[in-house]
């Protein structure tokens, strides 16, 4: 079992619900995983020092940590730090339905990829169409990710736009 600092996935998750009076809502309380559930694989998640850390298990299916609450239009801002050799991401507008591939998580993913292909920030459609927005045509975006450092990201999902 290999341990990776997957604080990436959930540290400082905040969400702005786009309603008549938008208010920021923190998705992670910094203490425990209340309001979250683990889906699919067998990786583990723990909370320490106000951070969520994922512990991957080699050779097992993808594991997802998901909020129990569904959101419509939103702005999601988060910070992440990921170990080399790990491929991760932040799912959004995603589901896990029994009738679809036996509950496999599917939907959009903000890619976190510390490999040399440098696709962090690209959009991948998990368990459906594959790459929707790889960063191969955007070298400046590929250079934005800093391996071994804290990175910031923002996802805006308003109406049909991401």
Locate predicted features:
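Bacterial Sec-dependent N-terminal signal peptides
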Residues: 1-22
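Carbohydrate-interacting regions of secretory-pathway proteins
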Residues: 20-162
């Amino acid at each position: 079992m290999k341990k990776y600092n997957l604080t990436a996935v959930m540290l400082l998750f905040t969400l702005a619900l786009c309603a008549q009076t938008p208010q920021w809502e923190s998705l992670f309380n910094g203490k425990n995983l209340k309001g979250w559930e683990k889906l699919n694989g067998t990786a583990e998640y723990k909370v320490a020092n106000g951070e969520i850390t994922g512990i991957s298990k080699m050779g097992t299916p993808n594991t997802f940590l998901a909020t129990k609450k569904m959101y419509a239009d939103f702005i999601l801002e988060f910070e992440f730090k990921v170990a080399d050799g790990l491929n991760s991401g932040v799912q959004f507008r995603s589901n896990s339905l029994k009738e679809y591939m036996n509950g496999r998580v599917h939907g959009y993913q903000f890619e976190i990829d510390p490999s040399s292909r440098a696709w962090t920030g690209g959009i991948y459609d998990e368990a459906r169409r594959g790459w929707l927005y790889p960063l191969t045509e955007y070298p400046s975006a590929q250079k934005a990710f800093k391996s071994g450092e804290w990175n910031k990201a923002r996802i805006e999902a308003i109406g049909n736009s991401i």
